[in-house]
Amino acid sequence: MQTVLAKIVADKAIWVEARKQQQPLASFQNEIQPSTRHFYDALQGARTAFILECKKASPSKGVIRDDFDPARIASIYQHYASAISVLTDEKYFQGSFDFLPVVSQSAPQPILCKDFIIDPYQIYLARYYQADACLLMLSVLDDEQYRQLSAVAHSLKMGVLTEISNDEERERAIALGAKVVGINNRDLRDLSIDLNRTRQLAPKLGHGVTVISESGINTYGQVRELSHFANGFLIGSALMAHDDLNAAVRRVLLGENKVCGLTRAQDAKAACDAGAIYGGLIFVPSSPRAVSVEQAREVISGAPLQYVGVFKNADIADVCQKAAVLSLSAVQLHGSEDQAYVNALREALPRNVQIWKALSVSNALPARDYHHVDKYIFDNGQGGSGQRFDWSLLQGQPLDDVLLAGGLAADNCVQAAQVGCAGLDFNSGVESQPGIKDARLLASVFQTLRAY
């Protein structure tokens, strides 16, 4: 044990002694009640589990979330999480034990106390502050310390997340009978990330162990791929860095998905409830899903999606006017708009409105060489036609800035997701008729995307 980790643990020992003076165990031990929220049970089930983390700062990133409101964070996480992790280390993560009861009161899930635990006192303190589980790191503890600390946790009906980061610690975790093992993809000695650690260590943990992959997970593609090795994921920094936390969680759990061609407020709500991030409003008069500004306002009133206006060879002033009055998050160009058009549009649009460009894919991939284009939509050229192009063209391509469109529905969305684009763009495949979305089809698509 050395460098960053050694320094943190040395400082933690000093903190523990000071806290014992300030808040002696005898002053609160009689008030401690056993946990009634079962951490081990919460991570069981057919679907991949998610431990979502409340984290203000870290040694590798500094302050991650300025506007850190644990109650608000927990109120969002409760819709997605199997358990919620709370950083309580003060010096390096700007955490606090005071965050634990706030989160516990704001969400029904088991609460994990994430700290560098080296003393039974910390576990009693965590339970007093309403934690239902604690992290024990084999990089910090010897076997005797681990046995003592896990026994204290279990005596309080708390769960233990046992963290490992190499083969030696994996062997120890097995010998110690750890039920839930977290594989930390971050090397706590130099803070580097290697997702291969999960791939290498998980298969050797054996049956009956719940495997959680920790650190460095920030995309839906990573989650889908690593879900073959892990039963769940602990995710913090990738979520905390985003202002729109709800969208950030959806982006990782489901992908960056859009439902296009919305014409009714109830359909916007159904899309949002199902798990979409973006809602598409089509301002192309020839489309059967075209809407006016008034209709668009009505759609937007239905749900807090990020709305994208779809245009085709439109007058730039018209695009900007609609973007302004409807507070659009992005404008999507579906015509023959060239670089000069995009340049002029970028100059005229507010900076916070993105520009997306739809590209038709037939026999070969088009170049993504526009300046000032934030995302591309790959379609078969006839938006809303329900036809797909040959997805094998996308193999081996970097697709972080691409949404895949064309003929997407419940029967092919998983295959589409595995292509590796940032997200999927649904339209006719979730409709009962053009412009009328089917809430059951929407729910089915997103449940299918989450079934891993």
Curated annotation (Swiss-Prot):
GO molecular function: indole-3-glycerol-phosphate synthase activity; phosphoribosylanthranilate isomerase activity
Enzyme Commission number: 4.1.1.48, 5.3.1.24
SUPFAM superfamilies: Ribulose-phoshate binding barrel (SSF51366)
Pfam family for this entry, one: PRAI
Pathway assignment: Amino-acid biosynthesis; L-tryptophan biosynthesis; L-tryptophan from chorismate: step 3/5; Amino-acid biosynthesis; L-tryptophan biosynthesis; L-tryptophan from chorismate: step 4/5
InterPro entries xref list: Aldolase_TIM (IPR013785), Indole-3-glycerol_P_synth (IPR045186), Indole-3-glycerol_P_synth_dom (IPR013798), Indole-3-GlycerolPSynthase_CS (IPR001468), PRAI_dom (IPR001240), RibuloseP-bd_barrel (IPR011060)
UniProt-listed CDD domains: IGPS, PRAI
Catalytic activity: N-(5-phospho-beta-D-ribosyl)anthranilate = 1-(2-carboxyphenylamino)-1-deoxy-D-ribulose 5-phosphate; 1-(2-carboxyphenylamino)-1-deoxy-D-ribulose 5-phosphate + H(+) = (1S,2R)-1-C-(indol-3-yl)glycerol 3-phosphate + CO2 + H2O
Keyword flag Cell membrane: no
Region (Indole-3-glycerol phosphate synthase): 1-256
Annotated TM spans: none
Region (N-(5'-phosphoribosyl)anthranilate isomerase): 257-452
Isomerase found in the keyword field: yes
Assigned keywords, A-Z: Amino-acid biosynthesis, Aromatic amino acid biosynthesis, Decarboxylase, Isomerase, Lyase, Multifunctional enzyme, Tryptophan biosynthesis
GO term, biological process aspect, one: L-tryptophan biosynthetic process
Assembly and binders: Monomer.
The protein's role, per its UniProt record: Bifunctional enzyme that catalyzes two sequential steps of tryptophan biosynthetic pathway. The first reaction is catalyzed by the isomerase, coded by the TrpF domain; the second reaction is catalyzed by the synthase, coded by the TrpC domain.
Similarity comment: In the N-terminal section; belongs to the TrpC family.
Protein name from the UniProt record: Tryptophan biosynthesis protein TrpCF
Organism: Salmonella typhi
Chain's gene name: trpC
